[in-house]
Amino acid sequence: MDIFSFFSADFWQANSLCFMFISAFLSATVLPGNSEVIFVALAVPKLMLGSLFNVDILALILIATAGNSLGSLTTYGIGRWMPKFDPKNYRTLWAINQLRRYGAIALLLSWLPVVGDLFCAIAGWLRLNFVTSSLFIFLGKMVRYVALLFLSTPFLL
């Protein structure tokens, strides 16, 4: 494989789900990933070919959700390693209070920019149950990508 095949359209098309996973994973961490842009760019051509829920669309949703969820669980794991401290930042105090009040169900909002990453890290720091935290993170991320899919369909009509 030569270096120029990396720039070909065939290479990107053949590996689109892999790139979606990587972008979704990075988007859920503090690194930039632009998963929404890539998701819509991959979903729109598939939507133009057929129905709203075909195998390609479902695979795209599952891959994006899995990558984004694993990125958030990485942030959760980093939160578990953080030593106990007395937070003084208003945003951190607010997130801690919300997670103490609502528990792991608050992680349904883990898809939100900035606050979602903070929720995941604090959930790990508070030692919330890993299985229930994973479930709510996964559900929140999936709802986000399904909503993004429905928001992008009016532009096809």
From Swiss-Prot:
Pfam families, per database record: VTT_dom (PF09335)
Keyword Transmembrane helix (UniProt): yes
Membrane disposition: Multi-pass membrane protein
Keywords: Cell membrane, Membrane, Transmembrane, Transmembrane helix
The keyword Membrane appears for this protein: yes
Disulfide bonds listed in the record: none
Localization per Swiss-Prot or TrEMBL: Cell membrane
The organism's place on the tree of life at top rank: Bacteria
Segments passing through the bilayer: 3-23, 24-44, 47-67, 105-125
GO cellular component: plasma membrane
InterPro entries, per the entry: DedA_domain, VTT_dom
Family per record: To E.coli YqaA.
PANTHER family named in the record: ALKALINE PHOSPHATASE LIKE PROTEIN, INNER MEMBRANE PROTEIN YQAA
Protein name: Uncharacterized protein HI_0489
